[in-house]
Amino acid sequence: MSPVYVNLLGSVGLLAFWYFSYRWIQRKRLEDPLPPWLRKKKACALTRRSRHRLRRQHGVIDGENSETERSVDLVAALLAEAGEESVTEDTEREDTEEEREDEEEENEARTPEVNPMDAEGLSGLAREACEALKKALRRHRFLWQRRRRARLLQHNGPQQSHHAAVFCRVHGLRGFQVSVWLLLTLFWSTGYGVSVRCTYHGTDINVTSNATSMNCRLNCTCNHTQIYNGPCAGAESKLPLNVTFRQSRRQWHSVMLTFGFQYHLEGWFPLRILNESRDINVTEVYGEVACFTNDTNITMGQLTLNLTGRSYVLRALARTSPFESSVNWEETNVTDNATSSENNTVTVMSVLTVYAESDYIFLQDMCPRFLKRSVKLAKNNRRNTTFTGTNVTSLPEWTLQQCQGWKYWTTLSIMWKNRRSALLRAKSRALGHWALLSICTVAAGSIALLSLFCILLIGLRRDLLEDFRYICRDEGSSSTKNDVHWIV
């Protein structure tokens, strides 16, 4: 199963567990706290007035021994069920003041005070926490503004302090919106509509038994602004592309990117094609490495190779796997002065197809970094940069008999071609992101469950303490035990 669906299923399961836990807690809180055997005996029929009289009869004064209210209520219910409720004539002839108190208690019984935690559960507690946080923030902001106003009044006088206070209020109201707008604008403008193209032109091609060389010139532009113009040799070091990583685990990644830039920008790519296709007769070579963003702001890469009138193009789309799309070179723009035959075309296509997957993955990984780095170079006014030096680019000690394929590139391509151990594939990076998201989801679920348990304990701490005290008293009181066994 895809990691995307696994994480989605885990998130849905976590939300469902949270919802049903909340419903179960709410249902348990709304149930009667009395045991079933006592709830069936009409214990809840006692009014607040009769319970008050029973408390007074048993010597419990209002306002004291608040912890024993539940135990007294239980004793009152037991006495009422046993028929031992006796109200003397003296208690019925109370003075006017006591009757008024009884009426007030009856009114309170009709409209009892409901704790928000008991009425709404976790939602009420969350609402109270939000209100408390808002009050604390308003209080903190008020104190900060008052201290700032006093400081401005002390230094600048009353008129200037008034204007400064107005500015602070406006800044406090609009600062967050302005910050969010700037961040969104920066995110939208970064890399959107950027195009970087590096074209090379190779002449005086010389293919011998032990070396392949040519005169090569490279020209790089960023949004039609020139950032490099000079020989192909050494272009990677002269362009501060900064493709290294500090992490030791990404050392191979740095090596591949650096070597890939040299391979495509310094003319080694057409030299490999010419060396392995010795039968074709080529006098000059044109090529291009292009990275750009399309209308939907998706990064795309393109490799172009032109051999005497025949062009070959490889296109790569970021955030896609080479195994999910067709990776192949296409022959386009065949000019009228094409001198190569069909056999030569088949030979070139066979050579290009061998490492098409490696070139595709490299474009996917290189183009986003190349675009960002080129934008920085353009902002640093690195324009019309012209370099001088030798134009000769060669592959020394290179023969088809000594090694099959380009030795350096094939050595590094083995890691890319293997689906399980690929380091630079976009899908592997996506799996890494989903793994991090899975860890964060599990951590968030654990924190949520822990917070739910803590909130439950906080809301029920008083009831738990009363239950523990009642259990302790019940174990130490034999009379209460006898009454309970007698009712059962």
UniProtKB/Swiss-Prot annotation:
Query: Got any disulfides in this one, which pairs?
Result: none
Which residues of this protein are annotated with the site description Cleavage site? G193, V194
> Which GO biological process entries does UniProt record here?
symbiont-mediated perturbation of host apoptosis
Compositionally biased spans, kind Acidic residues: 83-107
One cellular component term (GO) for this entry is:
membrane
Which residues does UniProt assign to the signal peptide? 1-22
UniProt keywords (A-Z) are: Glycoprotein, Host endoplasmic reticulum, Host Golgi apparatus, Host membrane, Host mitochondrion, Host-virus interaction, Membrane, Modulation of host cell apoptosis by virus, Signal, Transmembrane, Transmembrane helix
* Pfam families assigned to the protein according to its UniProt record, in alphabetical order: Herpes_UL37_2
Q: What parts of the sequence cross the membrane?
A: 439-459
Q: Where is this region: Disordered?
A: 83-119
Q: Which InterPro entries match?
A: Herpes_UL37_HHV-5-rel
Q: Which residues are glycosylated?
A: 206, 210, 219, 223, 242, 275, 281, 294, 297, 306, 333, 337, 343, 384, 391
Q: Which family does it belong to?
A: Belongs to the immediate early glycoprotein family.
The name on file for this protein is: UL37 immediate early glycoprotein
Which source organism does the UniProt entry give? Human cytomegalovirus (strain Merlin) (HHV-5)
